[in-house]
């Protein structure tokens, strides 16, 4: 997998804010690899997480322009830190190697409604890429991956 740039935005929740953000990506010619929008602990505020493939020189300039949008509270380009995805892969048939891989990758093997095995695993994008490669002999019928979850890490605070 190519290196990804992850941008995290905190936004107010009015209609159209996501469309304005996406329009800026388009105008800058930056391709979105994945996009996720979710609620935050703060009512009325959402987090938009966007990944782009490769290192684009224009991403920092794009972040600067996104900061100027009315409903944007914060923009951060995330480097390092914690990045996780979820992979769900349906296989044609079970195989002895499947359960060894599940143990190795700390994955779960489930059964789909049609009886086919389904592998569920969370991990870094690179880990899931490696698992998919190793699952190839098990005949991957289809798979789905979530977008990168990459919380902006701040110094720990006391919670008690």
Predicted regions and their residues:
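Long, contiguous binding/interaction regions
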Residues: 1-6, 10, 14-45, 51-86, ...
